[in-house]
Design a protein with these regions (language model features):
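A short beta-strand motif characteristic of beta-propeller blades
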Residues: 36-42, 86-90, 132-137, 182-187, ...
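A fold-wide structural signal in alpha/beta-hydrolase
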Residues: 322, 346-356
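Short loop/turn segments that connect beta-strands within beta-propeller blades
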Residues: 31-35, 77-81, 125-129, 171-174, ...
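A conserved hydrophobic secondary-structure block that centers on an alpha-helix together
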Residues: 1-50, 56, 201
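Active-site-proximal cap/loop segments of hydrolase catalytic domains
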Residues: 354-502
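Non-catalytic accessory segments flanking enzyme active sites
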Residues: 1-5, 16, 96-149, 184, ...
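A flexible loop/linker signature enriched in serine peptidases of the S9 family
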Residues: 17-26, 41-46, 62-72, 82, ...
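Hydrophobic beta-strand positions that form the internal "hydrophobic ladder"
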Residues: 13-15, 59, 109, 154-156, ...
Length: 502
């Protein structure tokens, strides 16, 4: 299931599905009064959002280019043939991916186009769907931004003059397509990575990573604020849909290595919290497990966080088998998550650890920048340092440590294996991206062009030499490698099936 969006009058729901796993979706529209599907059928669309007009007569959607890049926004009138659909926006720069959505206030349709390093936003009033889309601020190199509607104002989330992002505000009745219409609302703070802000009638909910932990901060219109307190144990927190514009309740989920996904409502002003539901774990005593954060030291002296969970009866005496998981790419911050299946390992004396190497975003944008392009090997060195720390501190048995990762995390575990085959007894590589030089040299493949900003273009120096120096496929030599379990997706549009096979 991809899209699932109600029209504003709750007459229709637009929903899409992918039945082959190739991320090519078919969109249908259901009449909620009758339960019947309308004749409207939109095949071969992207899972990049949909947006309704206020009257429920028009629907915006996105289609891909031949490389499967979401590139074009269309406007479809309900009940009319697709051939009559209107092209609203077409992104010709192959580095940019397009999405469409609606502000929580339901007053604006927002089109967002973004590369790995810059972005641009366009808007259309939801009650004037046939108007042309207007650019908020023209795109600039290395500047990212997005907007949300906040009643009498608009809020912008941007890295302009702020590596870890800041928030700006502009009056709704001002010409906010001009840069000088925007004033600072939340200042930049190095190391506090602001991911975005959800606007509600009376407050903003700011989502950020701070000291390698995700958190939510509530900012009221009088500029006072409150942090949602979730304790010190490494955890994940995710907002729910929270579709209601004028509300004082915030719904979110929390989970950790020792706590199942738990749904809460919290009053934004008082902080009063109500537990709504926790994923049941029958016959499990959660007090049997303990989690902690430890810090490894990389070769250049950088401290790297590692989250560790074990059974309380598992001794720290270098006897426990262990699994180390990592990703470390695309500024993706990887919070700890709960897994019932993992409990089976922990009950049998295993230790499970989650590395946060450079290349992710856990410690701010600079943490990501220090693990991409010509600094990519920091990601592998950090993960190796995490493994060495687990061994040296007696948390795991030196001869029984496995490493696991998928996609770009498959590149990570492949590089760790070829660099330090002695450190791991086994490797789990899920849809691994291991032949990076060949893949990134072919601009006809899905994602390649936009990924040059993350990895570099191996058709040029110094990237060719640097990438060949760490590519797992190009650095496999006769050696005593650990056992490898590799998986592939037959129709995977990101990592083609032949790459894990290599």
């Amino acid at each position: 299931l991809g899209a699932f969006d109600l029209s504003m009058d709750h007459r229709y729901v637009a929903w899409s599905m992918d039945t082959a796993g190739d991320e090519r979706y078919t969109l249908r529209i259901r009449d909620l009064a009758t339960g019947d599907e309308l004749d409207d059928r939109l095949d071969e669309i992207s899972n990049a959002g949909v947006a309704w007009s206020r009257d429920g007569e028009w629907l915006y959607y996105v289609t891909p280019d031949p490389q499967e890049r979401p590139s074009t926004v269309w406007r479809h009138r309900i009940g009319t043939p697709r051939v009559d659909d209107v092209r609203v926006f077409d992104e010709t720069d192959e580095r940019f991916f397009v999405s469409v959505g609606t502000t929580r206030s339901e007053d604006w349709t927002v089109i967002h186009t973004a590369s790995r390093t810059s972005s641009e936003t366009l808007h259309v009033a939801a009650d004037r769907p046939t108007d042309d889309a207007t650019v908020v601020l023209e795109r600039r190199p290395d500047v990212e931004y997005g907007i949300d509607h906040w009643g009498d104002s608009f809020v912008m989330h941007t890295n302009d003059d702020a590596v870890d992002f800041r928030l700006l505000v502009a009056a709704a009745d001002d010409d906010w397509t001009q840069p000088d219409a925007w004033t600072e609302l939340v200042a930049h703070e190095a190391g506090r990575r602001i991911l975005g802000a959800d606007a509600f009638a009376g407050h903003l909910v700011i989502h950020e990573w701070y000291r390698a932990q995700p958190r939510m901060r509530i900012l009221f219109r009088d500029r006072t604020e409150r942090i949602v307190d979730l304790g010190a144990e490494p955890h994940d927190v995710e907002p729910s849909a929270n579709p209601q514009w004028d509300t004082e309740l915030l719904r979110f989920t929390v989970q950790s290595l020792t706590m199942p996904t738990t749904l809460f409502d919290e009053h934004v002003t008082t902080g009063e919290r109500t537990l709504l539901r926790r994923v049941p774990t029958p016959n499990v005593d959660l007090d049997d497990y303990v989690a902690e954060r430890v810090w490894a030291t990389a070769g250049d002296g950088t401290a790297v966080p590692v989250d560790v969970v074990r059974h309380v009866d598992t001794p720290i005496d270098a006897s426990a088998p262990g699994v180390l998981y990592g990703y470390g790419a695309y500024e993706m911050s990887l919070p700890p998550w709960f897994s019932v299946a993992r409990l089976s390992l922990l009950d049998r004396g295993y230790v499970w650890a989650l590395a946060h190497p450079r290349g992710g975003g856990e410690l701010g944008r600079q943490w990501y920048l220090d693990g991409k392009l010509l600094a990519k090997t920091n990601t592998f060195d950090d993960t190796i340092a995490c493994a060495e720390h687990l061994v040296a501190s007696g948390i795991v048995d030196a001869n029984r440590l496995a490493v696991r990762g998928g996609s770009a995390g498959g590149l990570l575990v492949g590089a760790c294996m070829t660099r330090r085959p002695d450190l791991f007894c086994s490797v789990v590589a899920e849809v691994p991206f291991v032949d990076i030089v060949s893949t990134m040299s072919d601009p006809t493949l899905p994602l390649t062009v936009t990924e040059w900003e993350a990895w570099g273009d191996p058709r040029e120096e110094p990237y060719a030499t640097y990438m060949l120096g760490y590519s797992p496929y190009d650095n496999t030599v006769p050696a005593d490698y650990p056992a490898v379990y590799a998986t592939a997706g037959l129709n995977d549009p990101r990592v083609s099936v032949h790459e894990p096979a290599k």
